[in-house]
Amino acid sequence: SGSCSLKTCWLQLADFRSVGTQLKERYDLAKVVRVTRKSRLEPRNRKLGTPTPTDLVHLESSPDYCARNGSSGSLGTIGRECDKRSAGMDGCQLMCCGRGYDHFKVTVTQRCNCKF
C-alpha cells in the first residue's frame, strides 16, 4: 500500500512544583568550592567529597538571611510575623533563626454594615 507511519517524539518538562522541590533539595546540599590554578573546582572541605556533575556548587557561602544587610538589601527576619504551627519557611522555627519569638493574641473589632 502507499501509506506510511509517522512517529513523533518530544521531551516534556516535569511539573513546576517537582522542579522547584528538586532545586531546593540540591540548594540545601550545595557544596562550597574553590577554583584551582588549573581552573578545576575543588571542595573547600574535602570531607564533603568532590561534587558530582548534578551537584549545585557555589564559590561563596550564602549570606545570613536572618540578619539585616544593607549591602545586599536584606532586611533580615527580626520583627516579622511567623506561623508557629508551620514547619515551612513561614514557621517560627526557621524564620526566627533560633532567637526565639513572642507569642501574642490580637483581637480586631470592625464595623461591618450588616443588615438583619
Curated annotation (Swiss-Prot):
Its main location: secreted. The keyword Transcription does not apply. It comes from the Eukaryota. Disulfide bonds join C82-C97. A lipid is attached at S1 (O-palmitoleoyl serine). Glycans are attached at N69. The keyword Cell membrane does not apply. One of its GO terms (molecular function) is cytokine activity. Keywords: Developmental protein, Disulfide bond, Extracellular matrix, Glycoprotein, Lipoprotein, Secreted, Wnt signaling pathway. It is found in: Secreted, Extracellular space, Extracellular matrix. Palmitoleoylation is required for efficient binding to frizzled receptors. Depalmitoleoylation leads to Wnt signaling pathway inhibition. GO terms for biological process: canonical Wnt signaling pathway; cell fate commitment; neuron differentiation. GO terms for cellular component: extracellular space. Belongs to the Wnt family. PANTHER family: PROTEIN WNT-5 (PTHR12027:SF77), WNT RELATED (PTHR12027). Ligand for members of the frizzled family of seven transmembrane receptors. Probable developmental protein. May be a signaling molecule which affects the development of discrete regions of tissues. Is likely to signal over only few cell diameters. This is Protein Wnt-5(III). It comes from Eptatretus stoutii.
